[in-house]
Amino acid sequence: MKNIAIIGASGYTGAQITSLIHADAGLSVQGLYVSENSLDKGRELSELYPLYSHLPYVLNPLSDDVKAKIVAESDAVVLATEHSVSLELAAWFYQQGLAVFDLSGAYRFADVAQYPKWYGFEHTHPDVLAEAVYGLAEWNAAEIAKTRMIAVPGCYPTASLTALKPLKSLLTSAYPVINAVSGVTGAGRKAHLHTSFCEVSLTPYGVLGHRHQPEIATQLGQEVIFTPHLGNFKRGILATITVQLQPGTTEEQVKQAYEVYDNSPLVTVKHNAFPKVDDVVHTPNCHLGWKYDANSGYLVVASAIDNLMKGAASQGLQCIKIHFNL
């Protein structure tokens, strides 16, 4: 039994991964934690989320004494915190010997020069960053098992990379074009006018400037055009991706490329059939569907995931189970 502390548990992702860890026979929840300044400190998680009325956990303030208690009682810590908060907490817990599963973007780029541009801070822990592994579970399992610093991927990158990585050797130099729509839970739990019930509407955002674009490009090894959209639904992501394949590529080669997922139970691949968000919401699954026009050389692949599950919490759980061989 591995004990897992969860910091930032009051948010959607933190609450979701709490429920998953609680339900796993090989894991136990050491405790839930929020900032000492949080309005939610001292409250039960079920007060915030009646859906989780079966979870008997209080949101404790994260003091220095509490951090020491976490180190003494835990095998790992999950960080569902702001990027700048994870930057410091991840390094501290890693240096104390715990395994760290960071759901923020603070350790996703190996290159420290990326952080000022995309996250607005200088990376102050390059030594810990050098140990970090990108936690794309179906692709990096061997590395996840070896390191104690796992940067769980973003939601859009998970959907996009799961679709694109099998095709890498077949791509031309043309940029893949990714159009993706996410439910409003992707914007977090804090209230904002543009995500309120009466205001939310399907619209693109972060055009040619979203931080997930370089994350996708870095992990794919090729530049991409990425346009995210806000959808008027609660959860889920659908990414529709258009790519150009090398001249002479056959449909059979594409089928063979996607056979990489034959032993990946959470990834389903269909030819000439396309996924929908409703089929993956509240699941850890990724559904892919593709169609190829050999005459033009263009392939369209669609990828559907739950942004809070495969795009965050359940992939975090995958990484935990891979790391601890559970």
Curated annotation (Swiss-Prot):
Family: Belongs to the NAGSA dehydrogenase family. Type 1 subfamily.
Reactions that this protein is recorded to catalyse: N-acetyl-L-glutamate 5-semialdehyde + phosphate + NADP(+) = N-acetyl-L-glutamyl 5-phosphate + NADPH + H(+)
Native source species: Shewanella denitrificans (strain OS217 / ATCC BAA-1090 / DSM 15013)
Name recorded for this polypeptide: N-acetyl-gamma-glutamyl-phosphate reductase
PROSITE patterns with a match to the protein in the record: ARGC
Function: Catalyzes the NADPH-dependent reduction of N-acetyl-5-glutamyl phosphate to yield N-acetyl-L-glutamate 5-semialdehyde.
Signal peptide, first to last residue: none
Localization per record: Cytoplasm
Annotated EC: 1.2.1.38
UniProt KW Cytoplasm keyword: yes
Enzyme type, top EC level: oxidoreductase
